[in-house]
């Protein structure tokens, strides 16, 4: 799947149509991030919350239609993003509701307002995380990496509230986890704090690796560990999502540590 999220303040679809495969998320890393850098010491949590009930609507051949629907939903102060599924259709997911009833209620209100047409509810049991127990944790880790790898080649572009943009580093991590049912926080600092510290020798695929790229000992960049010496990340403006080496001169001198959420 390729996910695209558009700010409610975006004024033009032209840039969207030129950016199929891009995702808009408020910046959590990047040269102009509005999110404050977080201290090195994490507040360790044991596990991430699971994704709950989500509304899925739309099945469009053209991305512009999914963009318009996403913009309408964001204008209603709803969390929303759209994506292309394996069939090649663009679809939209809305919210993260505590119960099926609340998801249906919201969907019916949107339907009555003619914002959406048909819909269905994505339940907690539909995600990969719900289908994996401790014995199958490795499969979930592989699925997180496989999800992230679908975005290789998608442009990085720092996101803002009134622009149409690509992934930033923490946005890539968040989407890879949330698509698999794990509610990873949005910013790199929050992600650092939410995980369990992992020494380099214990890294497993799907763990997140963190870096200080601004000359401080504060988190400013994150990637998804893919095995061996490599990780997947959204590097900087003007570049595409790609793999990189942990032992490269640049990253090994800026490495802060790793976090696991499983």
Predicted regions, residues:
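Acidic/polar low-complexity segments and flexible, solvent-exposed patches
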Residues: 2-8, 13-157, 162-205, 209, ...
């Amino acid at each position: 799947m390729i996910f695209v999220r558009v700010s409610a303040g975006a004024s033009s679809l032209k840039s969207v149509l030129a950016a199929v495969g891009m995702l808009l998320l408020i910046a959590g890393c990047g040269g102009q991030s509005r999110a404050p850098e977080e201290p090195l010491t994490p507040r360790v949590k044991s596990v991430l919350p699971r994704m709950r009930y989500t509304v899925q609507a739309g099945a469009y051949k053209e991305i512009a239609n999914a963009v318009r629907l996403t913009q309408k939903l964001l204008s209603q102060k709803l969390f929303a993003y759209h994506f292309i599924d394996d069939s090649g259709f663009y679809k939209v997911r809305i919210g993260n509701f505590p119960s099926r009833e609340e998801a249906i209620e919201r969907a019916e209100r949107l339907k009555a307002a003619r914002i959406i047409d048909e819909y269905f509810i994505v339940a907690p049991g539909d995600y990969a995380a719900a289908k994996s127990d401790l014995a199958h944790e490795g499969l979930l880790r592989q699925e997180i990496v496989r999800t992230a790898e679908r975005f290789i080649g998608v442009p990085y572009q720092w996101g803002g509230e009134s622009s149409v943009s690509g992934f930033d580093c923490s946005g890539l991590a968040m989407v890879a986890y949330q698509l698999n049912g794990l509610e990873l926080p949005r910013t790199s600092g929050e992600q650092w704090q939410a995980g369990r510290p992992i020494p380099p020798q214990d890294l497993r695929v799907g763990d997140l690796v963190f870096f200080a790229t601004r000359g401080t000992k504060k988190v400013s960049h994150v990637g998804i560990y893919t095995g061996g010496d490599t990780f997947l990340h959204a590097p900087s403006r003007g570049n595409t999502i790609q793999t990189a080496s942990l032992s490269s001169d640049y990253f090994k001198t800026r490495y802060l540590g790793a976090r696991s959420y499983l």
